[in-house]
Amino acid sequence: MAFFSIFAKYLENEKMKHIFMVNTVAGKHSCLNEVKEAISRDTSFSDYEIYTPESASDNTDFIKKYLEEHPNQETRFYACGGDGTANKVASGVVGHPNASMTVLAHGSGNDYIKYYADLETFQDADKVLHGEEHRVDIMKANDRYALNATHFGLDAVVAKAMNKIRRHTIFGGKMCYPFAVVWGFLTGMRTKCTVYADGEKLNDGKICLCTVANGKYVGGSYKCAPKSKNDDGLLEVCLVKPLSRFRFPFLIKTYTEGSHLDNPKFKNLIVYRRAKQVVIEGGKNFCVSLDGEIMEAQRIVVDNMQQAIRFVAPTV
C-alpha cells in the first residue's frame, strides 16, 4: 500500500505545475537558496519554476495573470516567506478551482501554519512538498483578503510598528514583534470603533483590541482563537474591551495560553462570538491588519468564504 501511495503522489506531481513564490526579503535573510536546494533533491518535481517578486503585490498579480492564461492547468503555489507572502498568494489563488497553495515558512511572522503544525515542520521542504490537501476558509475584507486573521485596535498599532522595524538590524527578525508590542502598549490601548457580528452590536464604541480569525494564532505566540475551525464557514470574533495598563499583562498571559475565553476573571472584559459576517465601523485613519498587511478604511465588511482555498499541510 505504501508503494502505491508514493507512486500516486509521483504521478500527481508529474502532471501538476509547481510555482515557488520566494519573498527574498522575508525575515532577515532570503530563503531562495534553500528553495533551490530542496527542489534539486526531489526528482518528482519535473515541471516547476521559481518567481521572485519585485514587490509584495507582484505575487498576487503574477498568480492571477498566470491562472487566467492557464485555466486548465493544475497548479500549486508555494508561499516561501511569512504570513504576508501567504496572504498575497492566497489573494491570487482564491476563485481559481485549478489552483492550490502551501507555505514554506521563512519569515518574521508565521501564524497561520500553527493551526496544523509547528514552524520547524513547515520549514522542512520535503514534508511540505508531499503534504495533504485541505479545503479551508478565507475571509474577504472589503476588496482584500485575509487567510489567518483580521485584527485591529492594539493589534493594528502593533502590526504597523512591526512593518516598520521587521528588517532592522537589531530589532528585526524574531524580536520585532515584542518591540512592536511595547510600542502598542504605550500608544494604542484604546481605539474608537464599533463592531457587529451577524448584525449584533458587540461594543459601545471603544475597544482595546479585536481579532476576527480563521486561524488560531497572531503575533507568533498569542493563541487568540483557540476554538477556531478553519473550514466551518464561521469567523472567530474575540473583542477585548478597554482596560488599564496595569491589568493588561494579566490578560496577555492567558491570551498567550489560549485560556482567555474560559477564564472567569475576564468574563466581563471579553466578548466572543462566531459569525459569518463582521462589520467594523471606525473613524478617520482607522486601520486593520490583514495577516499583518495594513488596510485603512472607515467601514470594513468581513465575509467568510467557506472552503474557498485548497491548502496543503504536511502530514504530522
Q: Where do the language-model regions lie?
A:
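ATP/nucleoside-binding phosphotransfer catalytic cores, i.e., glycine-rich phosphate-binding loops
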Residues: 197-199, 229, 239-316
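ATP/NTP phosphate-donor binding region
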Residues: 2-77, 87, 91
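Catalytic core of DAGKc-family lipid kinases
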Residues: 19-21, 27, 53, 95-208
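Gly/Ser/Thr-rich active-site loops/lids in small-molecule metabolic enzymes
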Residues: 167-176, 226-246
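A generic structural signal for short beta-strands and their flanking turns/coil linkers
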Residues: 189-191, 206-208, 231-236, 276
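Short acidic/glycine-rich loop or secondary-structure boundary segments that cap or lie
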Residues: 155-158, 203-205, 217-221, 245-249
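Short beta-strand/turn micro-motifs composed of small residues
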Residues: 22-24, 81, 241, 282
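Glycine-rich phosphate/pyrophosphate-binding beta-alpha loops
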Residues: 151, 155, 211-225, 294
